[in-house]
């Protein structure tokens, strides 16, 4: 069943609003309205974002970060396996296992056992030549760091820790990913130079000797000679070494994607309210549709012992009607008391089907047992972070629809009596002056209301970044509570209602002028 309150209009979306431009006479206004058409001014507080961000899904930005961190873990393990499988050939160089086997007839310089004993000198004694063992060690070290960092990111995201749901956490992820990505890039380049000696031999003092030794493995004519396995693995890039190089670049790309999605997550957290972000999946729907017949029987049986609804029930029902303190709707008459007191089924429905409500109902204001609206406020901490409750209701937002169908019609009738259809250009000019004056007043009043709501939203986000024991938290909480009192005052509510009346008046005048312009020949 639909959970939208009865007679509730559809939600207003600023991006779907199409203004109804009217074309005034050029001889009267000089074409000014053609150049600057009057557009609706969407208010920050009256048009909240209705989009819900499901950050618990694997396809969401945090979910993609979890997937990428898991892939980095797998690629780091693969790099360990590939690089470790080639370390045995490097140990042979240092111990001189192949001795005179390198003393080929065409070498002419007696490389022999001297190469085996002086292999390490290439990397440290002469400079400009990368030791393969040092390059592999560097890549293994960076793979270990990436493995640990990715494991931490994955674990903190999967266990749904509170730290992983803050903007500061994703800022740390961005910084760590950038550092590790740069270091892995350097390690991969060094590894390429280390496992491919001919790539770094040009311009070095041992370039000609290395080319002479390794040339036999690059030409088909040398296949008949005795092939030393240690020298072969030194001169030729093994398949597992090539795989390690490719995995190194893939890790760099993965870290770049993590940075992108972490920045995207931070932007969404800054743009949307916390109540619009779902970090955990809400199981709010039953496995099977409810039995309607049993539900009706339970409701009918429960009406005997149900206490009568409180007198302020009209203020507690989540409907699009704004009730004033004197029981009127925006200065007009409201429904009679018998309308909502004669049927006790509405409170019973609220008690019987709490599990079939949609996600939007969990974002509605809560009510206490005595029927009063509970307005959350910031308070001094009692037991550290454990005593801090999650603010799930965006109480500093209101929707523009606060009048029911009957009250809107009555209000429209008043504007029709005050501003009847235009019959002459003089009357149109008078309407235009009233429209301009009302528009300026509406913008000024709307800006005043928006300042309060924007400040509430800013303080709400700042309080999550402060420790509850700090002085900054206490000062921000006091200011938050003060603004909540200002917003709950009668002066603020009267300004809000007057602002909505002004908007209705301006819309009516605009429609009258547009109708007159369309009727003109």
Curated annotation (Swiss-Prot):
Membrane spanning stretches: 67-89, 134-158, 169-193, 242-263
Chief place where the protein resides: membrane
GO cellular component: apical plasma membrane; apicolateral plasma membrane; bicellular tight junction; cell junction; cell surface; cell-cell junction; endocytic vesicle; lysosomal membrane
Positions with biased composition (Basic and acidic residues): 390-399
GO molecular function terms noted in the UniProt entry: protein domain specific binding
Classification via InterPro entries: ELL/occludin, Marvel, Occludin, Occludin_ELL
Cytoplasmic topological domain: 1-66, 159-168, 264-521
Modified-residue entries (Phosphothreonine), positions: 303, 402-403
Extent of Basic residues compositional bias: 380-389
Keyword ATP-binding on entry: no
Subcellular location: Cell membrane; Cell junction, Tight junction
Compositional bias annotation for Polar residues: 366-375
UniProt entry keywords in alphabetical sequence: Cell junction, Cell membrane, Coiled coil, Disulfide bond, Membrane, Phosphoprotein, Tight junction, Transmembrane, Transmembrane helix
Pfam families: MARVEL, Occludin_ELL
Sites bearing Phosphotyrosine, chain numbering: 367, 397, 401
Residues modified to Phosphoserine: 300, 311, 319, 338, 358, 368-369, 407, 489
Topology class, membrane: Multi-pass membrane protein
Positions of region (Disordered): 1-20, 300-329, 361-405
Record note on modification: Dephosphorylated by PTPRJ. May be phosphorylated by PKC during translocation to cell-cell contacts.
Family membership noted in the UniProt record: Belongs to the ELL/occludin family.
PANTHER family reported for this sequence: OCCLUDIN, OCCLUDIN AND RNA POLYMERASE II ELONGATION FACTOR ELL
UniProt free text on domains: The C-terminal is cytoplasmic and is important for interaction with ZO-1. Necessary for the tight junction localization. Involved in the regulation of the permeability barrier function of the tight junction.
Subunit structure: Interacts with TJP1/ZO1. Interacts with VAPA. Interacts with CLDN1, CLDN6, CLDN9, CLDN11, CLDN12 and CLDN17. Interacts with PLSCR1. Interacts with LSR, ILDR1 and ILDR2. Interacts with TJP2/ZO2.
Protein name, UniProt field: Occludin
Gene: Ocln
